[in-house]
A protein has these predicted regions:
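Hydrophobic-ligand binding "helix-grip"
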Residues: 31, 38-39, 55-104, 111-112
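Hydrophobic pocket/interface hotspot
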Residues: 20, 30, 48, 62, ...
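Conserved catalytic core of Hanks-type protein kinase domains
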Residues: 23-24, 65
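Pocket-edge structural micro-motifs
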Residues: 52, 75, 158
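Short beta-edge strand/loop motif at the mouth of beta-sheet-based domains
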Residues: 2, 8-9, 15, 19, ...
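Beta-strand/loop substructures that line and gate deep hydrophobic ligand-binding cavities in soluble
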Residues: 6, 80-135, 144-146, 166-167
Length: 167
């Protein structure tokens, strides 16, 4: 969901809050659902960098690391053509137990600082990756992230941002 300059996603995931938290802060777990390589320093002030798709890098800095309830970090892309430099947006992930057995977690992700079509692009991206996270926390494996996006408006926006389309 897009609300002003923010993208907001809420979902219930299988697994404890600690297990879900680790999916964001352990490089081996992170690349199971988002990215193909990762270098993470999950502590306040620590940096992260991961390759989302071949040649596309996301970078940021951890602001709050409060396992297993909250993770806040800055976010941006190393490619200046994408229009969102590292540190110019912020992601706030909160986790809370859901259900009576402690084996489900309510995740709320709020990504702020996204103006114009960046909100639409990141809403699409988070939707895709959080679905992959749900598959992995449910005991499955996530399929490889598609290199090509389905045809449509988002494809045109991605190509335009990457400088691959003049339209």
């Amino acid at each position: 969901m897009i609300d002003g300059d923010a993208v907001i996603h809420e979902l219930i995931l299988p697994g404890s809050a600690g297990q879900v938290f680790d999916m964001f802060t352990d490089a081996r777990q992170l690349i199971r659902w988002i990215g193909i390589s990762a270098d993470l320093q999950p502590r306040p002030g620590g940096r992260f960098r991961f390759e989302v798709t071949p040649g596309q890098f996301c970078e940021g800095q951890y602001v709050i690391v409060d396992r297993p309830v909250r993770l806040v970090f800055t976010w941006g892309w190393t490619d200046p053509g994408f229009g969102l430099a590292p540190g110019t947006s912020r992601v706030d992930v909160t986790l809370a137990p859901a259900g009576d057995d402690g084996q489900q977690t309510r995740l709320r992700l709020v990504h702020t600082g996204l103006t114009g079509d960046l909100g639409l692009l990141h809403d699409d991206g988070w939707s895709r990756f959080l679905a992959r996270l749900a598959a992995v926390t449910g005991g499955g494996e996530s399929a490889a992230y598609p290199r090509e996006r389905p045809a449509g408006r988002l494809t045109a926006l991605h190509r335009q941002r990457a400088g691959k389309d003049s339209s």
